[in-house]
Amino acid sequence: GVSVSHASKKITRATTIFSNTEYENFTEAETIRGNVTQRSQSSDDFTRIVGGENAKPGQFPWQVLLNGKVEAFCGGSIINEKWVVTAAHCIKPDDNITVVAGEYNIQETENTEQKRNVIRIIPYHKYNATINKYNHDIALLELDKPLTLNSYVTPICIANREYTNIFLNFGSGYVSGWGRVFNRGRQASILQYLRVPFVDRATCLRSTKFTIYNNMFCAGFDVGGKDSCEGDSGGPHVTEVEGTSFLTGIISWGEECAIKGKYGVYTRVSWYVNW
C-alpha cells in the first residue's frame, strides 16, 4: 500500500523546471511532481497519461507541447493563430518557452510540426503562486508569429460561460498530453489521450484534504489506474459535443497519479472565458 504521508502529497502535473534552490520554499505537502520520493515503487510507471492510449495523428490538433529548460514540461491548447492557453503554474518567468504545434511523436519528425517562441506570458490577474500554486491556474501565451492552421494545427472551440458549464456537466471529457518525468522512467513519445468521467463536487471534496475551489473540478476514476500525470499540466480537458470539441478544463494538479480514491484536478475554463 501507499503510506499516508506519501499519498497525501500534492504534486503538480508539470515536470520539474525549478532550480534546486527553489525546492526549499515547498512544504512536504507540496512536493513537485517529478521529484517524487523513492518510497513508492510504482511512481516509476506513472510517467505519462496513465492508462491512456496513443492518439492518431491530427486527432487532437489543438494540443501543443511546451519546451523550456526541460523538454515537454507541459502542454497547452491553441486558441487562435497567435495565442495558446496553458496552466499558470507551468510558467517560470526566466524560462524561454517554445511552443510546438502539430506534434505527434516527440522522437520523430513528421513535418507537421510548427515551432514558435513565446513573446508574452499573461497569467490570470488573480493568480498568485506564493499564496496558492493551483488557484486560478490558467495563463495565455502569445506566439512570435502566427501558426499556419491546417488539419494538424487547429484551434480548440471555446463556448460562452453558460455553455462551457453545461458541456462540462455532460459528464465525460478527454485529456491528452506527452506527460513524462524529469528524473527517471519512460516518457510518452506519442501523444496519449484518456476519457475521464466528471466527478461531482461532494465526492471530489471528500477525496482530498487540499482545498478544491469553485474554479476547479475533479475528473477521473475512483479505482485508480487512469489519470493525467507529470508533464501533462496545462494541456486540454475537452468535451465533445456532436462531433465538435470544446475546451472545458486545463490539466492542473493531483496527488501522485492514478491512485485509488484520488482524482485529477482541473481548472474550470467556464470561469475564465470572459477574460
Curated annotation (Swiss-Prot):
PANTHER family assigned to the protein according to its UniProt record, in alphabetical order: SRCR DOMAIN-CONTAINING PROTEIN (PTHR24264:SF65), TRYPSIN-RELATED (PTHR24264)
Residue spans crossing the bilayer: none
Broad class of the protein's primary localization: secreted
Sequence similarity: Belongs to the peptidase S1 family.
Domain of life: Eukaryota
Disulphide linkage map: 74-90, 204-218, 229-257
Key word NADP present: no
Protein name per UniProt: Coagulation factor IX
Post-translational modification note: Activated by factor XIa, which excises the activation peptide. The propeptide can also be removed by snake venom protease. Activated by coagulation factor VIIa-tissue factor (F7-F3) complex in calcium-dependent manner.
Residues carrying Sulfotyrosine: 23
Gene Ontology annotations of biological process type: blood coagulation; proteolysis; zymogen activation
Active-site positions on this chain: 89 (charge relay system), 137 (charge relay system), 233 (charge relay system)
InterPro entries with a match to the protein in the record: Peptidase_S1_PA, Peptidase_S1_PA_chymotrypsin, Peptidase_S1A, Serine_Proteases_S1, Trypsin_dom, TRYPSIN_HIS, TRYPSIN_SER
GO molecular function: calcium ion binding; endopeptidase activity; serine-type endopeptidase activity
Annotated site (Cleavage): 13-14, 48-49
Record flagged with keyword Protease: yes
Biological role: Factor IX is a vitamin K-dependent plasma protein that participates in the intrinsic pathway of blood coagulation by converting factor X to its active form in the presence of Ca(2+) ions, phospholipids, and factor VIIIa.
Annotated glycan sites: 25, 35, 47, 96, 128
GO-annotated cellular components: extracellular space
